[in-house]
């Protein structure tokens, strides 16, 4: 086999593996959990459920209360939180510093207010009136109601405390006290149904973002995904997570159960009240970006308002197999960004640094290819002489390589070496929160975490899943073709049909595969292609 063809096929085998990697990554991401809204099952403790008439009565009363309820808006330095006097729960939580595609604050709560609330508590279904609201101060807000159970009256209080240091965390305290003179509750536990629906997306954003939703739990120093039937005692935290945001709940001595109901996986936080005279439970809720700059402050007591430590919210950021390569890459990108605050330029500079670092290997590989090309006449003679004896041909080829001091695979090493680098950078660019909403060229590449766009269709083309007209995939395709031609040393006029497909068909195929990839990734790929073209011209001049 012609050595140039061997190298060319190695290149495209690498591209195939890249495409396969991205396909598997997308399939895995999109199938972690498919979640949808549904009516909540009315439930008080682990052993009791309501009949249909009771459920109907509760829902009818709830509908009337919703119509009479008022919204309470609380604004902090980072949040715009909206509470409802119906159930005293959060109905909207907007992040002021993190905008969506429409340049509005991202709303982390994505619920149908008529059917559910963000944090459904068993006691809520016994409250037949609206909650009373009291503003204690700018950071503390209280909702109070009363309910009866088995002839006994209870005072029911929900208190929300926001951080004074604008941390993405609030303390949620549930208090239940009996008003009559009796000792213990006559129930063993109560549940909190934690809504899995987070991050409200517009129709346009749903088309642009590969925004998988997953329910996660951290216990035994491991991040796990929720599944039907899983029940864990005393996890460090439980949460719902999208690609860039998370809502995580931590509480001492809680029990968590995942249960699939009506096709939807739900999270239940079970709280034991056996042998208690009153209830006073505190939950710490992180609601914000999946960014370790914000998540890790709750691992050291002195770093946060609430004095929390060893919560490990930072473990909610999924780490890929290539994490050890990603860390120095991100550090280099951050250095460039600190000098020139543009993440697109940081990706370009990082790519150049990587290419310079592997240049000695690239040069060695190209020199091996050039030396091997000089052996073409002798190789053709051997091929003609032993065309009917493949075993003898291989022996003679091996002897020729040894005598001439040539490694026939030397030109393939740089291509193979780039694979882990590419995979690491793909995972970095595809998941790094800092690239979300980061503009490179305003009006064209406005968000490095999604594809570039010069025209938005408003719908998805059926056959190719395109939502926009994009320019970067075309640039990538042509620069990839140029890079391959320059690197291969092949005579285009003498190419067979198979080789022509490798040259022209594969870049076109990868044009479709990469069309909707994040623009940050395509910037890396294009920069690599251009650098490779210039590098090969330099090497050819040097060797000549």
Curated annotation (Swiss-Prot):
Molecular functions (GO terms): membrane insertase activity
Domain of life: Bacteria
One GO BP: protein transport
Main localization category: membrane
GO cellular component: plasma membrane
CDD domains linked to this entry: 5TM_YidC_Alb3 (cd20070), EcYidC-like_peri (cd19961)
Described purpose of this protein according to its UniProt entry: Required for the insertion and/or proper folding and/or complex formation of integral membrane proteins into the membrane. Involved in integration of membrane proteins that insert both dependently and independently of the Sec translocase complex, as well as at least some lipoproteins. Aids folding of multispanning membrane proteins.
Subunit organization: Interacts with the Sec translocase complex via SecD. Specifically interacts with transmembrane segments of nascent integral membrane proteins during membrane integration.
Family: Belongs to the OXA1/ALB3/YidC family. Type 1 subfamily.
Protein name from the UniProt record: Membrane protein insertase YidC
The species this protein was found in: Borreliella burgdorferi (strain ZS7)
């Amino acid at each position: 086999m012609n050595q140039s063809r061997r190298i060319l096929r190695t290149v495209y085998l690498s591209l195939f593996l890249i495409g396969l990697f991205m396909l598997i990554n997308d399939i895995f991401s999109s199938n972690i959990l498919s979640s949808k809204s549904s009516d909540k099952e009315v439930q008080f403790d682990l052993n009791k459920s309501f009949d249909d008439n009771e459920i109907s009565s509760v829902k009818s009363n709830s509908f009337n209360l919703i119509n009479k309820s008022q919204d309470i808006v609380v604004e902090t330095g980072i949040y715009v939180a909206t509470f409802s006097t119906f159930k005293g729960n959060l109905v909207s939580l907007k992040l002021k510093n993190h905008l969506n595609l429409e340049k509005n604050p991202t709303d982390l709560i994505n619920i149908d207010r008529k059917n559910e609330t963000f944090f459904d508590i068993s006691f809520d279904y016994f409250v037949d009136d609206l909650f009373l609201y009291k503003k204690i101060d700018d950071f503390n807000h209280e909702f109070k109601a009363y309910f009866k159970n088995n002839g006994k009256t209870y005072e029911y209080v929900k208190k929300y405390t926001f951080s004074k240091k604008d941390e993405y965390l609030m303390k949620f305290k549930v208090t239940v006290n009996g008003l009559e003179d009796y000792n213990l509750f006559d129930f063993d536990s109560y549940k909190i149904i934690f809504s899995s629906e987070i991050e409200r997306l517009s129709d346009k954003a749903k088309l642009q973002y590969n925004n998988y939703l997953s329910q996660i739990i951290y216990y035994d120093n491991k991040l796990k995904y929720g599944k039907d039937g899983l029940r864990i005692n005393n996890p460090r935290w439980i949460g719902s997570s999208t690609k860039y945001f998370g809502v995580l709940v931590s509480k001492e001595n809680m029990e968590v159960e995942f249960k699939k109901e009506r096709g939807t996986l739900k999270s239940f936080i079970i709280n034991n009240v056996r042998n208690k005279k009153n209830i006073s439970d505190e939950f710490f809720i992180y609601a914000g970006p999946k960014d370790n700059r914000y998540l890790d402050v709750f691992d050291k007591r002195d770093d946060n308002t609430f004095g929390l430590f060893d919560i490990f919210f930072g473990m909610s950021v999924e780490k890929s197999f290539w994490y050890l390569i990603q860390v120095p890459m991100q550090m280099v990108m951050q250095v460039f960004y600190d000098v020139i605050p543009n993440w697109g330029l940081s990706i370009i500079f990082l790519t150049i640094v990587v290419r310079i670092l592997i240049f000695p290997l690239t040069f060695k590989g190209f020199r091996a290819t050039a030396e091997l090309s000089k052996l073409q006449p002798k190789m053709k003679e051997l091929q003609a002489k032993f065309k009917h004896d493949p075993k003898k041909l291989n022996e003679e080829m091996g002897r020729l390589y040894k005598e001439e001091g040539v490694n026939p695979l030397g030109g393939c090493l740089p291509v193979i070496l780039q694979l882990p680098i590419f995979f690491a950078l793909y995972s970095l660019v595809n998941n790094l929160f800092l690239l979300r909403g980061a503009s490179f060229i305003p009006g064209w590449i406005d968000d490095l975490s999604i594809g570039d766009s010069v025209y938005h269709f408003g719908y998805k083309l059926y056959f190719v899943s395109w939502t926009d007209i994009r320019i970067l995939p075309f640039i990538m395709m042509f620069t990839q073709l140029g890079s391959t031609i320059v690197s291969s040393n092949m005579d285009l006029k003498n190419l067979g049909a198979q080789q022509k497909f490798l040259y022209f068909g594969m870049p076109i195929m990868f044009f479709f595969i990469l069309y909707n990839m994040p623009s940050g990734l395509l910037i890396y790929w294009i920069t690599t292609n251009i650098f490779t073209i210039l590098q090969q011209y330099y090497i050819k001049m040097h060797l000549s």
